[in-house]
Amino acid sequence: MKRTQSLMVWLLFFALMLSAGMATAAVHFTQNEFTTAESLDPGMTQSGIHFTLGDHYKSYYPEIRYGLGAMLEIGVKFGATSVTIEDRDKLGVLVGIDLKYQLIKEADGVPLDLSVDVGFDNTVVNSKNASEVTFSTVMSKSFALTDRGYKIIPYGGLEMSALYGSLVDESDTSVYVLGGIEWKLSQKFMLLLELKAGASTLGGAGIRFEY
């Protein structure tokens, strides 16, 4: 009963965050985070495919994440972005990297995980680029569904984004709120859903394998 109540509180919290963030919307090249606050164990790897639908652009990219140890985790992405420019769809390249450090680990007496993440994404279309530097604070909590490792992990947080480059009208700094769910459908396979809102609103989904 307590687990069900806690899960409902988390879902309500994310709904309030996202509804607040949807108050404004504008074109802004940014990507979903697709990460909980929990860092991978040393030597563990996750790889998967993600899709982001933003305002006037869509991104499709594979990503690999690797546990470095000492609560550190690194992620690398490389894929494609379709951008609507002057009513025409243009295809471009998306590359990115991020580094996550877990500050707090969930345990007895500690109700959640907390981490910080620094990232860099670069979108290149027609020899023009939109580069984004992000700093995120993410918190999450695991809810075990069975005793075999299947679980659901709601997560959310705040992100500071600095956008610049020749593909954007002017350099800009924005604040986003994000919320999502990682659902481990098996011990090695998971589904991710996320909504992110601030200067623009975007949503996305992804699948990952862990090994």
Describe these PLM feature segments:
Residues 26-56, 82, 107-109, 119-203, ...:
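Outer-membrane beta-barrel transmembrane domain signature
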Residues 1-41:
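Cleavable N-terminal export/targeting peptides
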